[in-house]
Amino acid sequence: VKRTTVSKFGLLALFSASVVFAQADGGPDGVAMKESDPGIPVTDPLVQEKCGACHALDAKGNMSRISWVRTTPEGWAQVIKRMVRLNGLPITPEESRAVVKSLSASHGLAPQEALPVMYLAEKRTIDETNIPNETMRGACAVCHSFAQPLSWRRSKTEWKSLQDLHVAMYSQADAQYRRPAEDSEQPEGRDPKDKMLRGEYALGYMAKAAPLHTPEWAAWRSRQSVPRLAGEWLVVASAPGQGRFVGAFSVKPGKSADEFVTSSTLKSLTDGSTVSRSGAGIVYAGYSWRGSSKGAAAAGKPDDLASAARETMWFAPDQQSAQGRWYWGDYQEFGLDVKLIRATAAPAVLAVVPGPVKVGTKGAQFRIIGHNMSVSLSASDIDLGAGVTATKIVSARPEELVVTADVAANAPSGQRDVAIGGAVLEKAYPVYSKIDYIKVTPETAVSRLGGIKFPKGYAQFEAIGFENGMDGKQGTADDIAVGPVDVTWSTQEFLAVYYDDDAKYVGALSPAALFTPNVEGPNPERRFGRNNYGDVWVVATAKSEKDKFGKPLSARAYMVVTVPAYQKWDQPEVSQ
């Protein structure tokens, strides 16, 4: 028997051909898998041209597979990349961008569907709280975030096709799907010994949680229109470790109706420094902003606010406000959390400085930052919330009021709204009586070794003070976040392996809580010549706040310092 060597290219060609023939013959992707849901027609000639070779167009304008899925711009960009790699799709970058635009509008998500999973497009590293049980975690959130499938809407047939694709391409997925669904409800009348598998449960769950047709999408299809975002916007922003910012965001029309040119200026509420940025953005589906911008000066350090950044924002359907993240770094670990409000002739309150104020304080000074605020006010016209009385206006400008106020000794702890001349800022600042405990955020973090062949992945921490709520218990929902606390930072060994000395090798933590990881690769100074990876505690010790025993308050977060990301799943082209 003669052996034949098959190259990687040959395998790819064979696999691609099988997909095409299967669709043509009515195989797994063709007519044999009957759709019970009505499809969403594809009317764009470019999409029909680029996708029609494999995805048949029926008499109703539906294209196989495509007409039974909806997703975000990143999702469609991901699909096109996969079609190029696996099936050899011939498409130029310009055509690809046009197809992503088109499908994001005709087969995208409604604003209400996209908002809960915007953190995926915003590249946030968070602990997800939307995973219903361990079965779904094992089936869908072991290899990627749960927001990945929740960023899609599919027919039940398409969810099954996606599951089959995972089994074919990723052996680990097959193993996960075959495990019993231990903590999930089982079908009535089923033998208890014959437990539903994770794959079965996940298929049923996703078909119900993220179906193709939803009331939100039906309503948005008729409302979707050309975004009219040109004009001036007010910005409120914050960056972990760098404080709060206010400023302006100017939007001008670009080359097409959904493209814009931008400029912005942000002013620090901590030290008054300013950062100017310029860039451009694209709006998908009438509300979903993807852009890029950079500062006027070159970035001098990894967390520099002038760094070139990508922008992801969600604009409200009324196009009067937006929220999102402008992020940068090789692992998108740095970023500004931003909120935009359209600037109009009406007054607006944006921020209150310095922020937290203690119960019983007399003559506390507040800087109220805003827009078009009246300068003909008396102290009685300024409402600072329950138990806080404005006593004097020190200075008044349309963009800033400086007032003094007294806080009653019996004022209840909690957030206060500020109201001036019809403008209201909710939860503008907290009133507190004491700081009962502190918390390090994020509570879990990932940093990546680098600096030789691969970039470093940094981590930024903050220490936030809290007062116990009405129940007097720590860590419950009614606790009051007071704000950042002045602390001393350090790292401590996370005791997992004897003599590994992770805290010595993983990297360094600055006084401002910016963690810089060590270099990648074997370290001859370390036992067994291991890499500098490891896990440690990041510890914050308060400089002033103490517990009931007179000891400084302290808290810690868990951090894993791991190897570089040798493969990345990203779609930066949607911001270009």
Annotate each language-model stretch with its function.
Residues 23-47, 87-88, 95, 110-134, ...:
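Electrostatic cytochrome c docking/interface patches
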Residues 48-58, 99, 136-148:
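The canonical Cys-X-X-Cys-His
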Residues 56-86, 145-171, 276-278, 282-283:
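Gly/Gly-Pro-rich "capping" loops immediately C-terminal to redox-active cysteine motifs
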Residues 88-117, 172, 177-220, 224:
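C-terminal capping alpha-helices of c-type cytochrome domains
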Residues 215, 223, 308-351, 555-565:
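Edge beta-strand at a domain terminus
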Residues 219-223, 227-317, 323-326:
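Central antiparallel beta-sheet cores of small beta-barrel/beta-sandwich binding domains
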Residues 341-381, 397, 423-476, 570-575:
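Beta-strand/beta-sandwich contexts
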Residues 360-422, 483-485, 502-506, 511-520:
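Immunoglobulin-like IPT/TIG beta-sandwich domains and homologous Ig-like subdomains
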